[in-house]
Swiss-Prot record:
CDD domains: cysteine_hydrolases. SUPFAM superfamilies: Isochorismatase-like hydrolases. GO terms for cellular component: cytosol. It comes from Arabidopsis thaliana. This is Probable inactive nicotinamidase At3g16190. It comes from the Eukaryota. Belongs to the isochorismatase family. It holds the Pfam family Isochorismatase. Does not possess nicotinamidase activity in vitro. InterPro entries: Isochorismatase-like_dom, Isochorismatase-like_sf.
């Protein structure tokens, strides 16, 4: 079974406290509801021998590496979201990096490919198939997926109920956009059946 999935990687994107927890400045409203499904996707991936890659945002305390439109959230008096080393930058409860087998990518922009070593790491690992879970569908999920397609990954899958946006309407519209460029969009149940 593991042989079937050896060219596959699961990208778990931005499942961090500052994006998921109630009351966080950058909370994705639909994020909390997908946590159990993301946990299950990770469990299934590990059972099948699929490489798990954790994609997280981490910024410096002054926000010098954050997008211009977010810099107002960072100053010497104000701690912005997902500051490296803070609780807000940690993965939500229930998700843990397996230091021996998993890989972690730190990004400072929407796409997991932008100014990171993700593409070269996937190439040297022999990965040609990507499965995506996490938040937020119109931003980091979508940009990563569109970049993967632009980089000619032949098989990109977004687990629709293990990804989320601020509203169901935004989520659905973005899933449709990704489906229209050839991305597979199964539910967790459909994807788990494919794994059997």
């Amino acid at each position: 079974m593991a042989e079937r999935w050896r060219n596959t990687a699961l990208l778990v994107i931005d499942m961090q406290n500052d994006f998921i927890e109630e009351g966080a400045v950058t909370q994705v409203k639909g994020g909390k509801s997908i946590v159990p499904n993301v946990i299950r996707v990770v469990e299934l991936a590990r059972q099948r021998g699929i490489l798990v890659i954790w994609v997280v945002r981490e910024h410096d305390r002054q926000g010098r590496d954050v997008e211009l439109f977010r810099r107002h959230n960072y100053s010497s008096e104000k701690v912005g979201p997902v500051i490296k080393g803070t609780v807000g930058a940690e993965l939500v409860d229930g998700l843990m990096i397996n230091e021996e087998d998993d890989y972690k990518i730190v990004k400072t922009r929407f796409s997991a490919f932008f100014s990171t070593n993700l593409h070269s790491f996937l190439q040297t690992s022999g990965v040609t198939k990507l499965v995506i879970a996490g938040v937020q569908t119109p931003n980091c999920i979508r940009q990563t997926v569109f970049d993967a397609v632009a980089l000619d990954y032949p098989n990109v899958t977004v687990i629709t109920d293990a990804t989320a946006a601020a509203t169901p309407e935004i989520h659905t519209a973005n899933i449709l956009d990704m489906k229209n460029i050839g991305v597979k969009t199964p539910t967790l149940h459909e994807w788990s059946e494919e794994l059997a």
